[in-house]
A protein has these predicted regions:
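Short, well-ordered beta-strand micro-motif
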Residues: 467-469
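Conserved SAM-binding loop of SAM-dependent methyltransferases across substrates and taxa
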Residues: 73-83
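Conserved class I S-adenosyl-L-methionine
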Residues: 61-70
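Nucleic-acid modification enzymes, centered on SAM-dependent nucleic-acid methyltransferases
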Residues: 4-60, 81, 86-302, 306-354, ...
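Surface-exposed cleft-lining segments at the edges of enzyme active sites
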Residues: 364-375
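A short glycine-rich, Lys/Arg-flanked "PGG" loop and its adjoining helix->strand segment in the class I
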Residues: 378-394
């Protein structure tokens, strides 16, 4: 297909290019308003970024899609701005997070119920320990049980199970999900939460050398395992009951401050004009096969995964998901379906545009398997871009926020290759914006040592914002 840009297209392209050349850093702006701070999530972009494109490129009532919604930033911003928001993700924790962030609650009811949950869980912790320990010994298979025992101290396991048992008794599914997300949020944190991990928000967990619980008891001492290191990491694990109560209270407060209650769809104070809110639609879904009608979406704002699985979301998310009934085996199988995964068996590799194929071939000369992994990534991203082209209305735009990747010492040109693939499918790409990352706020993977050769450290200082425009007219070859 050959895209043909008429006068209307040229005007739209100039507007899109101006947006891409604006300041996209947002370092001096608060990104924790509304429900954006409900739960840690690696590599999420600031809400001001999708808001900028939503406000500039769509009108209230029009449709905004994020087919790889992650923490739901685009979906929430579209909802707040009165657009019809649609979101999909393959990650079950992403669905729970986004659904909770956009679902109004009754704060007094939730606070009262939360206090009951904590009270009953504490009673179970002190007086039903044997029963809960029996539940813990029977509710997982051996592999999952081994994972739990490795990463969670015994008293923490009992406390978490006691809390979760009470959450599961809640009848209202929306309120139950609200509490489940609060439960997950005390595990997946920058400090590793109530687990024995040092850091889960950046997705690369390391177990502590020594841990003390909230009563001052030593719950684990693995210093022999760390004998080769000069400094042994230690951690004080806070009470799961107090952490859970603090988290759900904080999340309720966020809703209360902005008037986001059941049957009360008031506009937030920081918007100039009130608009009608449209209930968002979010579900589990694969961006390579978007369950949306053709030519029905006005704008897409999304952030695709890094190539070669550089940010492994499941590595951290499984710490919570195992408590919700998933086994390690199920999550491992599920992880292989992610775009950017490193599996090379039974994958469909597309013929790609020349510069993209050249990039793949140069990497293959250094490392054949990594070359196949990169070919898989670009093939899957071609599927994604093809689907986005299908669902966008003529004159619609897709905005990609992507990071670059350096594999085996080679820059694999993510923004350039994705632009080339998009152009081959019929998109017009007027420009690529650059935004400098505030690494502490973007929550990128960290390292305990400085390694100048690390591919993580080499590439994660900036990211790219690509604008894909679907022209009003396409000419067949």
């Amino acid at each position: 297909m050959i895209p043909v840009a008429d006068v209307t297209d040229q005007t739209a392209l100039k507007k899109l290019n101006r947006l891409l050349t604006d300041d996209l850093d947002f370092h001096d702006q608060d990104s924790r308003y509304a429900s954006h701070s409900f739960h840690a999530f690696p590599a999420k972009f600031p809400p001001q970024l999708p808001a900028k494109f939503i406000q500039s490129l769509t009108n209230p009532g029009e449709t905004v899609l994020d087919p790889m919604m992650g923490s739901g930033t685009t979906v929430l911003e579209a909802f707040l701005l009165g657009r019809e928001a649609i979101g999909f993700d393959i990650d079950p924790l992403a669905l729970l997070l986004t659904k909770t962030k956009i679902t109004p609650i009754h704060p007094h009811q939730v606070m009262a119920l939360g206090r009951e949950i904590v009270h009953r869980a504490k009673v179970s912790f002190h007086y039903r320990r044997d029963e809960i320990e029996h539940e813990l010994s029977t509710c997982w298979d051996e592999e999952t049980k081994e994972f739990i025992n490795y990463w969670f101290a015994k008293d923490v396991q009992i406390a978490l199970k006691a809390i979760l048992n009470e959450i599961e008794k809640v009848d209202d599914e929306d309120i139950k999900d609200f509490f489940k997300l609060s439960f997950s949020a005390i595990i997946i944190t920058k400090s590793g939460g109530v687990s024995l991990a040092l850091d889960l928000a950046h997705t690369r967990p390391h177990r502590v050398g020594r841990a003390v619980d909230w009563n001052g008891n030593v719950v684990c001492d693995f210093r022999r395992e760390h004998a080769h290191t000069k400094r042994v990491s230690s951690k004080k694990i806070r009470s799961p009951f107090e952490e859970f109560e603090h988290r759900y209270t904080q999340n309720v407060r966020a809703f209360r401050e902005i008037g986001f209650f059941t049957d009360q769809m008031n506009m937030f104070e920081y918007f100039d004009k009130p608009v009608s809110r449209l209930k968002p639609y979010v579900a589990i879904g694969n961006a390579q096969c978007i369950p949306v009608n053709s030519s029905s979406v006005d704008l897409i704002v999304t952030s695709p995964p890094y190539a070669s699985n550089a940010i492994d979301y499941m590595r951290a998310h499984k710490f919570s998901l195992v408590w919700f009934g998933y086994t390690i085996a199920e999550l491992t199988t599920h992880r292989r379906k992610y775009i950017g995964a490193e599996g090379t068996r039974d994958v469909l590799l597309h013929n790609l545009p020349p510069n993209t194929m050249d990039t793949i071939e140069r990497l293959s000369l250094k490392d054949r398997k990594k070359g196949i992994v990169l070919h898989r990534y670009y093939s899957e991203m071609k599927n994604v871009l093809s689907e986005m082209f299908r669902v966008l209305k003529p004159g619609g735009t897709a905005v990609f926020v992507v990071g670059n990747s350096n594999i085996r010492g080679q820059d694999v040109s993510i923004p350039e290759c994705l632009s080339e693939i998009g152009t081959s499918l019929g998109f017009l790409v007027p420009g690529i914006g650059i935004r400098r990352l505030d690494r502490n706020r973007r929550m990128m993977p960290t390292s305990t040592t400085v390694n100048n050769e690390s591919q993580i450290q080499q590439r994660m200082h900036e990211e790219y914002v690509i604008g894909f425009y679907k022209p009003l007219r396409i000419q067949d070859l």
